[in-house]
Amino acid sequence: MAADLCWLSLLLASLALSGAVYEDQVGKFDWRQEYVGRIKFASLESGLGAKKLIAVTDKNIIAALNSRTGDLLWRHVDKDTSEGTVDALMMIGQDAITVSGGRLLRSWETNIGALNWEAALEPGSFQAVSFAGSQDTARYVAVLKNSALSLYFLSNGHLKWSESLPESDTVQYQLLYSPYKGSVHVVGLVPHSHLTILTFSLEDGSISHQVRVLTPWLRTLHGTCGVIGEGVLVCGDVPMASVHIVSLLSGEETTRYSVQSLDIELAEDPTQLDVITAPQNGIGGSLSQFFLQIAPRRFLLMHYHDGVLTPLRDFSQVSLVNFATTGEKTVVAVMQCKTEGNPKSGAESEYLTGQNCAQEPWYCPGHTYSINLYMADSGRRLLETTMSFTLDQICVRPDSFYLQTFLRKDDSVGYRALVQTEDNQLLFLQQPGKLIWLREESLADVVTMETVDLPLTGAQAELEGEFGKKADGLIGMVLKRLSSQLILLQSWSAHLWKMFCDARKPRSQIRNEINVDTLARDDFNLQKMMVMVTASGKLFGIESSSGSILWKFYLHGVHPGSSFKLLVQRTTAHFPHPPQCTLLVKDKVTEKSAMYVFNPIFGKLSQLAPPPLQRPILQSLLLPIMDNDYAKVLLLLDDQHKVIAFPATKYVLQQLQELHSTIFFYLVDVEKGKLSGLRLNKDLSTEEIWEVLLPADQQRITVVKGKRSNEHVHSQGRVMGDRSVLYKYLNPNLLVLVTESTDTHPERCFIGIYLIDGVTGRIIHSSVQRRARGPVQIIHSENWVVYQYWNSKARRNELTVLELYEGTEQYNSTNFSSLDRPLLPHVLQQSYIFPSAIRAMQATITERGITSRHILIGLPSGAILSLPKALLDPRRPEIPNEYTREENLIPYTPDIQIHAERFINYNQTISRMRGIYTAPSGLESTCLVVAYGLDLYQTRVYPSKQFDVLKDDYDYILISSVLIGLVFATMITKRLAQVKLLNRAWR
């Protein structure tokens, strides 16, 4: 009995110590979307009941997706460097074999994503990997490096043998083939000279056969050559317009087949001769058929057997081709542009502005494609296998596709298709073209974002229209008020009726679909439109409360690595003028700039044409002045230091001429280590007025950061313990310049922090952190700067905070001018030890700036830590006194601890977090937070708790019951008191 009581007490104690998020709070005002990135390799389970899809992406991820729903089953994220790059994927049964960074060979159990085994590879550049075995059974994994061939056991990953390759300094070994007959073949190439074919024995790794074949016409094996049949190497030769075939088993001289001799109609000589072969299957056999690509959109299905090369079928207007096997049947899939019908018009015509892809050779009018299956051995088309689908974006083409084939009961071939488009969209289709699910994988690489308030409803707009129009007169305003109230009453009645109807339905049947037509601002402005720009050049409009994608738009021709800048020129506050956003794109390859103006609510290009940008843009500046349509003026500075204004109306140009002396730019030249300031002239030219030069051979500029334009400062000073006021140095023109040393040695590296006035070029403050290195994460807000760096001496991460004050007397309380500041501010500085690396940092922001500030820190683990700014206060005393206690200053301790209860995303971690975006809401207590990386996460934070709204668990029934009870008690007590007074009077 005593033992039972002891166990019960321990159980109760453990329950008391456990903590979690309440069940009704999970997903109530937050959501997370997980992505994997652009697919490099994919394998779909075959069979009618297959449910799994294995994918390897460019984000160094191996993942499994549910082929029925598109949901993520499991995901493994490797290093975000070249060491984590997945070079190859092979499937055998329920196991996946991958090569990572050319260093690690791994085996995965695909049902649960568990790691079966891992083996370290021999040094050298990775070339190829293949299964190997004997008697048509795979038992080993062969890995080819540029100078060695290694063989590993498939069951446990142990090394069986590793052999060096002869003449590896001159021969480029690139191809690996195993016939599953106790040997493995390695093919090396000396460009424009000869092929070297080596045959290794699987038992001891000895070279059983070596032959050299002259190939003076061959430059590379990749894309040009492939293995078919029983060890037959097929290569294309463009200059000679022929196909060369050599046997890897016998090593005989090449046999040349001219394309002209294959009875193929050619208008001109082929522009390319690429060989596309089917992947080697799990029992060692290879198909005798292959595709020969003779033009960008023309493919030939070829068959080779017993020295005879035969064309089976000629395909034109082809986008993509692929092979698939189910049972004993092997088919080829051909994707072609479906030319029937007219190109799309209507709503899509609004997107055509700035899109010039109609002249591209791959352009498909109507954006409709069809997939057809053909028997690989004969080229015969299979009936009832056509699948048609239409892409929702113009100037987008399919990039790759994979098949999931199965045999029906009547022994016919059925299939589903996974299509990946140029804009990183995944579509999973089934016959005859039904879309099962869709994933937008470009959201795994968000580079910038902004939020826009949702528009008012018709009733709200009608109510807003009452104010500011006195010309209607008293009677007119009263009638307008009555009509607007009737509209509100009508909408309220419709809302009550919908609630009544939904209450009678099961919860599964209640639909709260969100689309652009039903979007409306909520009472507290918590629901916003998130405009996201991805690295692939695709824009998204996402509703913040649910994460639903309402619109998307792809910018064709944007090269990887291009820079983007998103600006909100007009919000929804200026009804009936629509909101307006401007996206600036600077191409990394051509260095040309482009500008797109669009409506962020509907995702349509604006009717206002942006100015043509003939020169590269160096800097942009969004001014607070507006044109007649309430759009903020955007100034663009090109490489000739000329300024372009948008919109360039007469009213705007007049304002610029009046205010030109108060408009300044700054430019950063990283190569020269130069920060310069320019002033605008009346003729929209600029002149340089100051510059700061840093020794570029010793340090390089890494970050230049100003303050957020939408930031509000509620208090201009801090009340100290002696009741005096310490006034903040609130310079809106202040820039923070961060430099890192070019010397990376731990004893000599350093980082520099410079606070520079962007108008005068005056250095307000500078400091150097010795034995420190980046990357530096920084926040610049109000009168303080917080930055993080790595201390090489102490080998730890540190946070440093700077706060700037004018002193106990304010120089000018009504207007700040950088030209009239004779005294430098007082700078307070303090450093802290932080126990983790930091991937992203941002400060909370609210509508009026009254709420306490918190620092949101993204950790490598994917958690987001909400750290009160009070902990990063340089005035924290080491020894508290009565004045510091009066100010509630926390005593100084050098380390900042990470408490799990400060994580705002509990278990909803964000992989590879790149940025945190914060936006104010209509409630002063609430800040909206969006974290992006591989995943997207949106939530709300309350730095000072919810002081301006009732909590969700507020007990309305209890309070109402108490109030009603008090009212009745008051009435009864009053009646009893009257009776008592009457009885007393009669006495």
Swiss-Prot record:
GO terms for cellular component: EMC complex; endoplasmic reticulum membrane; membrane. Gene3D superfamilies: YVTN repeat-like/Quinoprotein amine dehydrogenase (2.130.10.10). Pfam families: Beta-prop_EMC1_N, EMC1_C. Its main location: endoplasmic reticulum. It is a single-pass type I membrane protein. Residues 978-987 are cytoplasmic. Keywords: Disulfide bond, Endoplasmic reticulum, Glycoprotein, Membrane, Signal, Transmembrane, Transmembrane helix. Residues 1-21 form the signal peptide. The keyword Transferase does not apply. SUPFAM superfamilies: Quinoprotein alcohol dehydrogenase-like. It is found in: Endoplasmic reticulum membrane. Residues 22-956 are lumenal. One of its GO terms (biological process) is protein insertion into ER membrane by stop-transfer membrane-anchor sequence. It comes from the Eukaryota. Glycans are attached at N812, N815, N907. The chain crosses the membrane at residues 957-977. Coiled coil: none annotated. Disulfide bonds join C225-C235, C337-C364. Component of the ER membrane protein complex (EMC). Part of the endoplasmic reticulum membrane protein complex (EMC) that enables the energy-independent insertion into endoplasmic reticulum membranes of newly synthesized membrane proteins. Preferentially accommodates proteins with transmembrane domains that are weakly hydrophobic or contain destabilizing features such as charged and aromatic residues. Involved in the cotranslational insertion of multi-pass membrane proteins in which stop-transfer membrane-anchor sequences become ER membrane spanning helices. Belongs to the EMC1 family. PANTHER family: ER MEMBRANE PROTEIN COMPLEX SUBUNIT 1 (PTHR21573:SF0). This is ER membrane protein complex subunit 1.
